[in-house]
Amino acid sequence: KLKEAGIHTIDDLAQLKEGIKIQGLRQEALHDLKEQAKLQVKPKCPDGKPNYLLKKIIEGKGLTILPKQNQGDIWFDLEGVQNPVFGTQLEYLIGLCYKNESDDSCIYKAWWAHSPSEEKQAFENWVQWVENRLKRYPDLKIYHYGSYEKTAIRRLEQQYSTKETIIDQWLRYSLLVDLLPIVTGSIVLGEESYSIKKVEKLY
């Protein structure tokens, strides 16, 4: 849509005049894209951190949809690799962080897999670990970044026909919280993407 409107480079977008409308693109989205382009062409901060702007707080977007903090909250990540010959996916690492009850330090826990059978076992062990923690912290949330984790969980429970009822319940009650839309709804980042590797430069 931008190219159709004659905008071919990031500089074109950054210099776009106010009030211009582009067919098929919401004004809010165009404004965010323009602000992001302006930040990207601007020299980076001396400390190497990307430029960013805080968005206006709007109910139902950004930080306003962040759940209330719970002592049992979990930060969750999956790492997978695709077999180039068979085209199959293997989630070789299920990792998570949670708070130490005694001093609030972060504890990292991982389940590794090197084969489909180990992948199934790792998935089942992870689900059971979360279920055990839910008994102690029924209001906890599982935070992840992007849609990959939720999609992979669905694939694993369907592929191995295991833990379907539990996963369905998790999804029905929004146990998993995707932080990506919360981030994109809260800031405009002067980077080419909102990948976690780009966003973490702010910290």
What residue spans do the PLM features occupy?
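C-terminal extensions
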Residues: K1-Y98, S102-W112, E119-A122
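Conserved DEDDh/DEDDy metal-dependent 3′-5′ exonuclease domain
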Residues: Y98, Y108-Y203
